[in-house]
Amino acid sequence: MKNLFLFALCTFSVSSFALTPRIETASNSDSFISFRTANDAIYCSGDIPGLTPKVECVTTIKGKPILPRPKDCEFEWGELFSVGATGKASLVCASDTPAVPDSQILKDDETIKGKGWQCTASGDSLTCSNQEKHGFKISQAKQKLF
């Protein structure tokens, strides 16, 4: 009976581990994280060495940007979202995007963590937030800052 209990416990532990979404963490100051959603619609980069810890994600939106283009923005607008370890999320006026073609794939219901932020894939969308609960939820069809 004792052996059966241990077998059942080990089987449960292994199956529970297999069902747990992968969580990765940036652990040192030189960590650079790049990832994309499984449908290749959203690309992100985070914790770039030498810059303030943050994650930036880009997607091609369908429709108008959620915020009007600032008058001083001469580059791309409405498709690049950013959130740092603290503070509010924002749209970024940028001439360059964080798209890294060979970045790791963040599968549905998986979460990746950086320095003070985390992102979770869900269906065709991605939600990224910081410790203060500020962030963004984006897909090609809808975008939201919170």
Predicted regions and their residues:
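C-terminal or internal capping secondary-structure element at the end of a domain, subdomain, or sheet
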Residues: 123-146
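Positively charged n-region of N-terminal signal peptides that target proteins for export
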Residues: 1-4
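A low-complexity, Ser/Thr/Gly/Pro-enriched, surface-exposed linker/loop concept
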Residues: 19-26, 54-106, 138-146
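Short, well-ordered strand-loop elements centered on a beta-strand within folded domains, enriched
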Residues: 49-63, 123-130
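Extracellular glycan-recognition/adhesion modules and their associated mucin-like linkers
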Residues: 29-41, 110-118
